[in-house]
Amino acid sequence: MRAALTTALALLLLPAAALASSPQQTIEAFYRWRMASAMTGAPRGDELKQLRPWLGRELLCLLQAAGELRDRAAAAQPDEKPPFVEGDLFSSVFEGPQRLRLGAVTQRAGQAAVELRFEADTGAQPPVFRWSDRALLRREQGRWVVVDIEYRARVEFGNHGALRESLRAALEPADPALNWPGEAATRCAR
């Protein structure tokens, strides 16, 4: 049921993504979809298709490769937890955000940076956890797309650095046990 609702929401938001005339509109549409979806870890088939309007070519390629690595690891080592199987890749916090407010936007020469102010309910004290990350965008094929997320929250169990950097580091080395050739990051950068 949730998958059907997510798909319906994505279809409603696709026209908005195609018409997004500013970095802010792209970010708002992307995170509206992201927070409504049940996606965890690297996106799977339909999720990847739904993300296409909002993400840059290289980032989409890296996420697809992360999904392939996850699937190979799960098949080759069924008793071990594969990489990219869970957690929110699009924010610092593993559980992901529930609410978003946009902060400062800087824009120059077809590139933009948008401050992201996230909130999530904790069910503990304090009841709301707040953090900030930053989205980097670029114009590709006449539209604004997300090309990276800088993780800025200082959390013990979460993402650190930046999304592209994390994906590249995990995807580049070959792993014969998984029949993984590596070099995915190099291939995606072309």
Describe each PLM feature range.
Residues 110-115, 121-132, 140, 145-190:
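Low-complexity, intrinsically disordered terminal/linker segments enriched in charged
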Residues 13-17:
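N-terminal signal peptide c-region/cleavage motif recognized by signal peptidases
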Residues 1-8:
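Bacterial N-terminal signal peptides that target proteins for export
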Residues 101-104, 132-139:
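Hydrophobic/aromatic beta-strand elements that line small-molecule binding cavities or substrate pockets
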Residues 21-81:
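Core segments of small alpha/beta cavity-forming domains
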